C-alpha cells in the first residue's frame, strides 16, 4: 500500500494511513539546540519507537489515553489521528536544564511538588515559556484545558516515575505533546530518551543530554540501548 507523507519534522515523519489513523516513522536523526546541532545515529529511530511504544502501552494499562494503536514495523507506529497542539508540556521532578538558567534554582534540587511548564513549539523563538494568558490569546488552549493537561501530566508522572524507579533509574523530567480527538485531549508524539531526562543513582546520564553535552554517538546509542533493555526486562 502506497502512503502519502503528511509532514516531516526533525526526528519523525507522519504518513497518511486511513480515515482515523496515521503512521509515525521514527528517523535516525538526533538533534539539539532547536535543530542547530544534528547528526545521524544509526538505529536510533528503532530504539525511540520501541521505547515510546513501551511507555504508551504502560500508560494505557494505567487508564491514561494516548494516540498509540500498534506497530507497523520496528520503527513505525500506527497512531490515532489527532489535531496536534503546538505546545510542549514539561514536568520537572528534579531541577536540570533550562529551569536552572531561568530561575535561582540549583542543579539537582528536588522539587517538593512536580513543576509543570508549557512552551510554544517554535525553533526560531527558541520555544518560549507560556502561561495561561498567552495560550488563551494565541488560541492554543483555554485555562480549563491547560489545567486538565496539568492533571494528566501528574498522573503520567506517578506511573512513569514509580516504574522507572523500579528499574534502577531516576526520572528528572519529561516532555509530552497533546492533540485533540473530538473533545478529548490525548497524549501524542513520543515518550523516549529524546524527551525525558533519566539518571541512575550515581547521576550517570542516559538520555539526549549526552548528545547535548558532546559525548560521542557510540556512547549515546549504548545508553539508549541499555535503558530500553532494562525497562523491558
UniProtKB/Swiss-Prot annotation:
Pathway listed: Purine metabolism; IMP biosynthesis via de novo pathway; 5-amino-1-(5-phospho-D-ribosyl)imidazole-4-carboxamide from 5-amino-1-(5-phospho-D-ribosyl)imidazole-4-carboxylate: step 1/2
Matches recorded under InterPro entries: SAICAR_synt/ADE2_N (IPR028923), SAICAR_synt_PurC (IPR033934), SAICAR_synth (IPR001636), SAICAR_synthetase (IPR050089), SAICAR_synthetase_CS (IPR018236)
Major enzyme class: ligase
Keywords: ATP-binding, Ligase, Nucleotide-binding, Purine biosynthesis
GO biological process, one term: 'de novo' IMP biosynthetic process
Keyword Ligase: yes
EC number, UniProt record: 6.3.2.6
Domain of life: Archaea
Catalytic activity: 5-amino-1-(5-phospho-D-ribosyl)imidazole-4-carboxylate + L-aspartate + ATP = (2S)-2-[5-amino-1-(5-phospho-beta-D-ribosyl)imidazole-4-carboxamido]succinate + ADP + phosphate + 2 H(+)
Pfam families (UniProt xref): SAICAR_synt
MF annotations from Gene Ontology: ATP binding; phosphoribosylaminoimidazolesuccinocarboxamide synthase activity
Family designation: Belongs to the SAICAR synthetase family.
NCBIfam families with a match to the protein in the record: purC (TIGR00081)
Record-given protein name: Phosphoribosylaminoimidazole-succinocarboxamide synthase
Organism whose genome encodes this protein: Saccharolobus solfataricus (strain ATCC 35092 / DSM 1617 / JCM 11322 / P2) (Sulfolobus solfataricus)
Gene behind the chain: purC
